[in-house]
Amino acid sequence: MHKYAAIDIGSNAVRLLLAVIAEPAQNPIKITWARMPIRLGEDAFLLGRISDEKANQLKNTINGFKYLIEAFQPLDFMACATAAMRTADNGQEICHKIFQETGISIDIIDGRQEASFLFKNKPKDLFSEKEACLLIDVGGGSTEMTLFYQGRRIASESFNIGAIRLFKKQADPLIWEAVEHWVKDNTAGYNSIVAIGSGGNINKLFRLAKGKKGKPVSCKTLTSIYKLLRQLSIDQRIKQFRLRPDRADVIVPASEIYLKIMQWSGCRNIHVPMLGLSDGMIRVLHERRSGIFFY
């Protein structure tokens, strides 16, 4: 039984995953999952740096996670920060201070490495080898996409467009054009493309659509939910759909990103296996320890 721990420091929240892998090539089994809503992206994308208040919140959260990790006694663990910390001028400085005070080392990973970790979550049972598959992860500050076919990664890219950036109107207007060109250029020529979505917003949209495990949700259904949510105020979304405040404001811009990518790639449905960056990190840790690779 191999135990692993992963901390994902995103733009909208900080997450801890404790998981075990019983057999060498078995999928991880989640033991505990924790989420702290710290919106680092709000500072990073608007101000260009993380405020002292948010930095202190992050330090306290990492310190709390540290005790859970120590109690779990994993074989190995990893902590990674993504778009918000990449953007913030003081991202490295904050990571250094947290290491000094908690002993937890945080790696600020670039977009391609983030996409590489997410690629490890490729669920083989959701598509056939004859189909191309587009993995889409929409975060708070960036969107990662990986296209693979016949078990091989064909193309992978990260774009500085995410739910918080759109909500706060901090996305470069030209970024939509770049995303559209990449998607169309890389998906052209395939008869069938399966979309796989990851991230907190698509997970929530899947639940709102009353999606069933192993079954995709149609673009038509997602569009209907998007139009309904868009008509409601943030308070109405919270009350009517019991959304967390930090989900209610960004779920609409996140929906726009998923729907546009599906439109440009010709995907009529999207699978949502409820996996994220921390799941990919667990797989990477196990590969390093065991030498057995998932993909």
Across the structure, where does each feature detected by a protein language model lie?
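Dinucleotide-binding Rossmann-like beta1-alpha1 core, especially the glycine-rich loop
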Residues: 79
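N-terminal basic/disordered segments at the start of proteins
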Residues: 2-29
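Preference for bulky hydrophobic residues occupying beta-strand positions
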Residues: 7, 36-38, 136, 159
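Helical "lid/coupling" subdomains associated with nucleotide-phosphate turnover
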Residues: 4, 18, 43-74, 82-96, ...
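A short acidic Gly-Thr/Ser loop motif
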Residues: 8-13, 136-142, 198-201
